[in-house]
Amino acid sequence: MKYIIGYDIGGTKCAVSIGKVDDSITLLGRHEVPTTRSPEGTLAALEQQTKEWLAAYPVSSIGISCGGPLDSKKGQLYQVANLPGWDNFKIVEHLEQKFHKKAYLQNDANACALVEWKFGAGKGTQNMVFITMGTGLGSGLILDGKLYSGTNDNAGEVGHIRLAEDGPVGFGKNGSFEGFCGGNGIARLAERMGGTPGGHNQRTRRSRKIRRRLCKIGI
């Protein structure tokens, strides 16, 4: 049995969690804050909670999940589309210096795929796909019983595939998969399809129209 702290870096919020790992994972605590354009400032807001857990539990390491592109070996983020201001941030080095624990970085979809494959619905399978749908959209691939991340850790970055020329913008690219199905894209689709926010029936009708359009383009 071991205790691990996890950092989840997202475009809308960042969170730190602690869990106990044996034959399964037990979540012991979680704390989240809004994501800002300052990586140092955002992580500082999670620092006190992390220190309290480090004092209370024999934590072995820190895991970090974040949308790509990133370099898991160097522990560095690159131009992550939904994290303006975080370009080229060396997040592993930053956390290791703060907390004096070994830290590991992984693409968020890859991290989810690994956990689901080892402990969840994918347990016992040799091939599976995990799709993340949050502020952005991505996927993690398990092929032949191993994580497949590609040459540059970007094998599952399906969110930027263009599906239509005039679709909603997904972080700079019109009509991308992420533009249609990411959190921001769905909101833009709802706005495009009409009107000001209304009651439940109006939102339901709008949602049905959106689903029909997505079905037409094969989503």
PLM segments and residue spans:
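Conserved phosphate-binding loops in N-terminal lobes of ATP-dependent enzymes
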Residues: 4-66, 73
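Glycine/GP-enriched mid-protein hinge/lid loop-to-helix segment characteristic of carbohydrate kinases
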Residues: 17-20, 28-30, 36-42, 104-106, ...
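Glycine-rich phosphate-binding loop and adjoining helix at the ATP-binding site
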Residues: 40-47, 51, 60-62, 69-127
